[in-house]
Design a protein with these regions (language model features):
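Beta-propeller blade termini and top-face loops
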Residues: 1-203
Length: 203
């Protein structure tokens, strides 16, 4: 759904972008993540709880399934349009529902036509969120059930980011660009803030 008047009116801009609901007490057929590119109005990405990822490049008039080569039937924990490259998009998937703790992290540089696995040296832990650094395009931040990680080479390798952080799942990340702060939302252990100004200077 889309509203152009702050929520007063809503218009459907898609058909069902999932595989459809299933019987039982565990929700299926639900969109879990949506993002719009800052480079183009109407360049939209969605992810669902049954592993479907779709892209629309015309404000929802047409949608393309871009998840055919991704692992099947996993929870799309985050889909993120790049703030540095128009065609780049990231997807993280979570397999906890199947007792699968593999870290699933993918990047595409062609609107999702093909994907590169960038989980590399991450330990076994479900991945909940990925963010780009707003100042340094080589830096990525990741929140997992095993804590936070950062990459200085676009996901080729990952480093633990744990100083001052308890051993806890990180469910969300956001960056306050002006003050150069990374904010981490954890599972029951409050919100943490980290100064990332020194990290942003690493090339």
């Amino acid at each position: 759904m889309r509203s152009m008047n702050r929520g007063t009116d809503w218009t459907a801009i898609s058909e069902d972008l999932t595989s459809g609901g299933k019987q039982g007490n565990v929700a299926y057929g639900t969109l879990t993540s949506i993002d719009e590119s800052k480079f183009q109005f109407g360049l939209l990405y969605t992810g669902s709880d049954d592993g479907k990822v779709f892209v629309s490049q015309n404000s929802g008039s047409d949608w393309q399934n871009i998840s055919a080569t991704l692992p099947k039937d996993l929870w799309v924990s985050r889909v993120v349009a790049s703030m540095h490259e128009k065609q780049r998009v990231y997807v993280t998937l979570n397999g906890y529902r199947w007792d699968d703790f593999t870290p699933y992290v993918y990047m595409s540089d062609n609107y999702g036509a093909s994907w590169t696995n960038i989980s590399n040296n991450l330990p076994l832990a479900a991945v909940n969120v990925i963010r780009e650094d707003p100042a340094n395009p080589s830096i990525l931040y990741l929140g997992t059930d095993n804590g936070a990680y950062t990459s200085f080479d676009n996901g080729a390798s990952w480093n633990p980011f744990y100083e001052g952080l308890p051993n806890v799942a990180v469910h969300d990340l956001t960056i306050q660009a002006r003050d150069k702060h990374l904010l981490l939302g954890t599972h029951g252990r409050s919100i943490y803030k980290a100064d990332i100004s020194l990290l942003q200077g690493i090339i």
